[in-house]
Regions:
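Structured segments of extracytoplasmic/periplasmic soluble domains
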Residues: 12, 16, 103-107, 143, ...
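N-terminal "mature-domain start" segment
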Residues: 2, 11-15, 19-25, 117-144
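Surface-exposed amphipathic alpha-helical segments
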Residues: 90-114, 134, 140, 261-295
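Solvent-exposed alpha-helical segments and adjacent loops
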Residues: 1-3, 11, 52, 57-120
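Long, compositionally biased interface segments
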Residues: 48-51, 186-205, 277-295
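Signature of long, low-cysteine stretches enriched in small and polar/charged residues
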Residues: 26-87, 197-261, 275
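Secretory pathway targeting signatures of secreted, lumenal, and periplasmic proteins
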Residues: 137-203
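Charge-rich, low-complexity N-terminal segments
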Residues: 101, 105-124, 154-172
Length: 295
């Protein structure tokens, strides 16, 4: 009976992400197979977590599982947990979930970015306006460019049973003066976001503009984290268009400019009615995390 291990994995890796629109999507899709079910199909999966129970294992909950790359397939990441018992396995899973997730996401980002080109046109604008560069898809176009606000996006048409739908992935980069550290709070970040988007991002209907959702179903979340040894303040939430029906999820990171005079925010947003948004948002997350300052 591996139910305790299954529960630990499902509750840690398969929990619903509530900072996306309904219906909520799990952070990771989780499937379980026992040792006898590990066949060629399973070995083709891109992300695999192996839990091995051995009473004589020398491992214990103090040891962080290390990733194995390309074990059975190309562009694959495998984590193996060796535990002495079910209880020990659950302890290791609970203790190292965040580290394993971080490793998986960084691996995802690297694979996504491997397909992105230079996009010199967009990066020339980003360097001029904000002194940064991003690893962008080559089909990401410049929608708007000002001294402190840049909007890039790409659109595609996707079909489902109800016909054709436009899918949009966009990037905003904006900067504003760094007055004090209180600006690194979710309230201040959303205030600045809304004022800039009202000014720069208008819908097709008169008096329509993008704004952050703040209703009871909009579970906007924030966390401080390190990216490339630099402090960043990350916000996840939902956006909508005032006086129109568009909406979707966004993720942003904010950090100090190199001279520490300004805050630079890099945001990705998705518009994909009728379609799941997790992977589309993850593609933008990879782009955001690729930021580098230019000199």
């Amino acid at each position: 009976d591996n139910s305790k291990i299954s529960y630990a994995i499902k509750s840690n890796f398969g929990q619903l992400v509530t900072s996306t629109p309904l219906p909520y999507e799990p952070e990771f899709d989780v499937e379980f197979v026992d040792q006898g079910g590990v066949n060629k199909m399973i070995k083709r999966h891109k992300t695999i977590l192996i839990v091995n129970i051995d009473p004589f294992s020398k491992n214990n909950s103090k040891e962080m599982p290390t990733p194995i790359f390309d074990l059975w397939a190309k562009n694959q990441i495998v984590y193996k947990i060796n535990a002495t018992s079910q209880k020990n396995a659950v302890t290791i899973i609970n203790h190292y979930t965040d580290s394993i997730k971080l490793g998986i996401n960084q691996f995802y980002y690297a694979n996504i970015l491997a397909f992105n080109g230079e996009n010199k046109k967009a990066n020339t604008i980003l360097k001029k306006n904000h002194s940064i560069k991003l690893k962008l898809p080559s089909n990401m176009l410049i929608k708007k460019s000002t001294a402190n606000f840049t909007w890039l996006n790409r659109t595609e048409i996707k079909k489902d049973n109800n016909g054709d739908h436009e899918i949009q992935q966009g990037i905003f980069v904006y900067s504003y003066p760094y007055i004090n550290e209180n600006l690194f709070s979710i309230e201040q970040q959303i205030t600045f976001r809304d004022s800039l988007l009202k000014k720069h991002v208008h819908g097709s209907v008169a008096n329509s503009y993008m704004i952050t959702r703040k209703d009871e179903l909009a579970n906007n979340q924030a966390q401080a984290q390190l990216i490339k040894n630099k402090y960043v303040f990350s916000v996840r939430g939902l956006w909508r268009v005032e006086n129109d029906k568009m909406g979707g999820p966004f993720i942003s990171i904010s950090t100090l400019s190199e001279d520490e005079k300004n805050i630079i925010t890099i945001e990705g947003y998705v518009y994909a009615p009728n379609f799941e948004k997790r992977e589309l948002l993850k593609e933008l997350e990879a782009v955001i995390h690729s930021f580098e300052f230019t000199h």
